[in-house]
């Protein structure tokens, strides 16, 4: 590899307004790229900046607001900024948990979008050294019954219902297919239907795992000369620019973006889990990072930035399942079930042997360098040479205009809403109509597709208010500690009052956990909103942050991490502001968990 002091620079590309538009880079952002590099970028460098500065990866519109959230308590071991948050649950054990969105991919390709959403959140958990213990999901779809649809055009209504049915079936099958094959219990969650989600479903996946408190791993590179090892599935062309796609609203033709959606393999992920946990036990791993959004690009620059070091990577060594892949394609591919790790120099064979045992690719593709730069080589040529900080901490940060949110309805019901009430009204018919609603009727038809008992830790599965798992090896035999977990969100309430609606989401998730007998101790959030370039949307977002902060502070449940999903709009029509909260609580004795059903 060329030395860090070499005058060789990547070959510049011809940058046009059309090329910048294709990469969703503004003229102002391109000026920042020129300033960071001191020259015209190569095409590979432009692609790297495109994904790392996307809303999905950089949080450039939301970071200024997220700072207002409470993130610390005596139980918090790791807060926001890592692959997952971690809390201390006692007896030397810690719990890693997080919620993430996979909304845009699940609209374009429902099965794979939802499946890879589950796969991605599971990797976030075991990247920390934790074995996944449970998953849950919070889902939002358009109407699936004619009575719930509001479109007056019968033909449009029929097309909408047909499309929504296909999305629901694909998403639920994807979640079940991945989780069941991987071997992690699904404890349910919540599913709601509203017309505003017809063109933009929400698929928020939550996962939780256990790790010994002294065996936690972090996504940080260190140690000059340490080898950088690529492990897992081979790299293909699937998912290229997936992070950029997730940072845009849907327009006509968005369904043609199927190549941007990743393809998952739960059996490969199961092998990757076991191999990673076994390799961690060797003591030879210095740092490890999932190749999630932005793939190899994100994992290399984030590991380097966290450690204040650089990485030199040779793309010719990256295992590839397709021929003729360019450096641009390899760096931006979001092929699933892949990890990047840094091993101690001289102990790399210990790590490689573990992955060979599990039948997985494991290849040394680079080395840690003292210079804080990401340098990429392909066919012997330097194709990218970028300061790590310019991709991460120095990414654009926008103070978007925050408008004034006005409730869309009067606080008091109009007179006509009360006119039909009285003793002559058929209230039994009203009750039957309510019970038939997709939002009220049983969701058993969904959660019965999920395996909720695998691993034999489940105390309370789907169908109740919260899931409960026992923590083997804690407490006393037969009276182990337990973890309770619940998800909650109400877009309608947040639409009427973003701050109060967000507070209700926190409070209801905490109540669900408390109803099992557990003490709520920490939270994770998934913030689903529309286009942040609209002041009224930022008004919703800012108010929701204030509501979450106030409620979490009052309840003593700090935010340990989460996800922001913006641009949830289709043809200019946004979803309801939908903050979803995941709350985790601790039970001193899992056998004393209180079920949701009557017992006597």
Regions found by a protein language model. Give the residues of each.
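Glycine/proline-enriched, intrinsically flexible loops and inter-domain linkers
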Residues: 2-600
């Amino acid at each position: 590899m060329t030395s860090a002091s070499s005058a060789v620079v990547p070959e510049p590309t011809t940058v046009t307004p059309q090329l910048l538009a294709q990469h969703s880079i503004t003229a102002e952002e391109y000026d920042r790229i020129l300033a960071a590099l001191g020259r015209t970028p190569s095409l590979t460098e432009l692609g790297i900046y495109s994904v790392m500065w996307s809303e999905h990866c950089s949080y450039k519109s939301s970071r200024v607001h997220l700072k207002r959230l409470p993130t610390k308590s005596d139980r918090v071991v790791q807060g926001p900024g890592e692959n997952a948050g971690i809390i201390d649950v006692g007896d030397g054990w810690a719990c890693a948990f997080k919620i993430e969105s996979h909304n845009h991919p699940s609209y374009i390709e429902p099965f794979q979008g939802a499946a890879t959403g589950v796969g991605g959140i599971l990797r976030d958990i075991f990247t920390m050294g934790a074995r996944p213990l449970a998953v849950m999901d919070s889902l939002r779809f358009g109407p699936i019954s004619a009575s719930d649809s509001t479109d007056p055009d019968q033909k449009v209504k029929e097309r909408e219902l047909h499309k929504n049915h296909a999305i629901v079936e694909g998403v639920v099958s994807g979640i079940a297919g991945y989780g069941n094959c991987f071997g992690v219990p699904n404890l349910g969650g919540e599913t709601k239907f509203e017309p505003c989600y017809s063109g933009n479903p929400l698929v928020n996946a939550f996962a939780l795992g256990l790790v010994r408190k002294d065996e936690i791993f972090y996504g940080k590179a260190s140690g000059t000369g340490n080898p950088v090892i690529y492990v897992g599935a081979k790299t293909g062309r699937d998912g290229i620019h997936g992070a950029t796609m997730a940072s845009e609203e849907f327009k006509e033709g968005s369904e043609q973006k199927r190549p941007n959606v990743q393809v998952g393999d739960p059996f490969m992920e199961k092998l990757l889990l076991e191999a990673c946990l076994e390799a961690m036990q060797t003591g030879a791993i210095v740092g490890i990072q999932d190749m999630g959004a932005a793939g190899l690009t994100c994992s290399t620059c984030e590991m380097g930035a966290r450690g204040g070091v650089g990485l030199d990577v040779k793309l010719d060594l990256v295992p590839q399942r397709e021929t003729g892949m360019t450096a641009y394609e390899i760096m931006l591919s979001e092929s699933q079930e892949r990890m990047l790790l840094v091993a101690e120099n001289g102990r790399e064979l210990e790590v490689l042997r573990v992955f060979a045992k599990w039948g997985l690719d494991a290849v040394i593709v680079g080395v840690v360098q003292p210079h804080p730069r990401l340098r990429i080589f392909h066919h012997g040529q330097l194709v990218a040479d970028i300061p790590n900080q310019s991709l991460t901490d120095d990414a654009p940060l926008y103070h978007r205009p925050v408008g004034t949110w006005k409730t869309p309805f009067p606080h008091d019901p109009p007179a006509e809403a009360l006119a039909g009430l009285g003793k002559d009204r058929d209230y039994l018919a009203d009750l039957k109509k309510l019970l038939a609603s997709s939002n009220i009727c049983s969701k058993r038809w969904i959660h019965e597709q999920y395996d909720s008992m695998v691993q034999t830790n489940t105390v309370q599965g789907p169908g109740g208010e919260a899931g409960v798992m026992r923590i083997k090896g804690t407490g006393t035999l037969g009276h182990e500690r337990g973890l309770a977990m619940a998800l909650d969100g109400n877009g309608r309430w947040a639409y009427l009052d973003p701050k109060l609606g967000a507070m209700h989401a926190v409070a209801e998730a905490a109540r669900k956990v408390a109803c099992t007998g557990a003490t709520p101790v920490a939270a994770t959030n998934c913030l689903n909103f529309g286009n942040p370039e609209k002041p009224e949307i930022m008004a919703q977002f800012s108010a929701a942050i204030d509501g979450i902060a106030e409620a979490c502070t009052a309840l003593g449940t700090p935010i340990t991490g989460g996800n922001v999903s913006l641009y949830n709009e289709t043809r200019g029509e946004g979803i309801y502001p939908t903050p979803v909260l995941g709350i985790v609580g601790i039970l001193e004795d899992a056998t004393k968990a209180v079920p949701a059903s009557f017992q006597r």
